[in-house]
Amino acid sequence: LPREFMARENDNIVASDEHNSRGIELADRGWLDEAIKEFKKAIDLDPDSAHAHDNLATVYAEKKLFREALGEYLTALKLEPESPTAHYNLACFLSTHAGEMAVAEYREAIELDPEYPDAHLNLGLTYADQGRIEDAMRELQTAIELDPQDAFPRHELAALLMDEGDYRSAITQLKEVVRLDAENFEAHLDLGICYAQKGFYAEAERSYEKAKALNAEDLLLNYNLAALYALWGRRADALAFLQKAVTVDRQKVQGWLATDTMFDSLKGDPEFDALF
């Protein structure tokens, strides 16, 4: 390359580094918009400056411009694929902001198409993961209204209602789930749990029987059947199903029993104690 071209290129790199340094100072002071301008100038002067792309990405992330941030992190990585820092920074961004970014994109999808059931469903699931239970329930309810024949959002809503202790509302959803999907083992099991919690033992037994027809060896099913019969005062049945559960995973069952009041009527019974 001609010497003057190389000199000009070096001048650009020096100037780029100056803008980059100024951008860092501004970002540290919280002047994010000004910092963005400096990092962009640095990139204009030296498009291959991975650290300028990286710094720009960090400021974008702080401003919650997640799509722009992701683009800059990926550019930095493309420029320096062997850089541990580039991989580390991208990983930090994803682990910190992936949930927030997903929410923003789902909401954008819904804004563009308000009657998009899967977008409402997945937004609801993301809210649930973030502990935003009321928001999650609202989105799942919308997904159900938009696609009443889909059992999945109903089951997810029922699970949230169960966690909140609203077994009556969960039962309403789960009855629909098993009507729409009669082979859904988990739904029959959950319906049985809800009925048992409300004191409807015969209904609980019927739901557990349907679950048993689909998977008789399931640990949770046998444990819950034992709990139901213990509450119901059917000692022999309770012990028989508890024995089945213990055979599958003794340690797990012991852990559950440590805090489970449903088995209080059996504690101290020689046959119950003999299981352990």
Give residue spans per PLM region.
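TPR-adjacent "capping" and linker segments in tetratricopeptide-repeat scaffold/adaptor proteins
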Residues: 2-18
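Short coil loop/turn residues that delineate tetratricopeptide repeat
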Residues: 14, 48, 82, 115, ...
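Conserved alpha-helical positions within TPR/SEL1-like repeat arrays
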Residues: 17-28, 51-62, 85-95, 118-129, ...
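Structural signature of tandem alpha-helical TPR/SEL1-like repeats
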Residues: 28-41, 62-75, 94-108, 128-142, ...
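Alpha-helical protein-protein interaction modules
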Residues: 165-168, 172, 179, 183-276
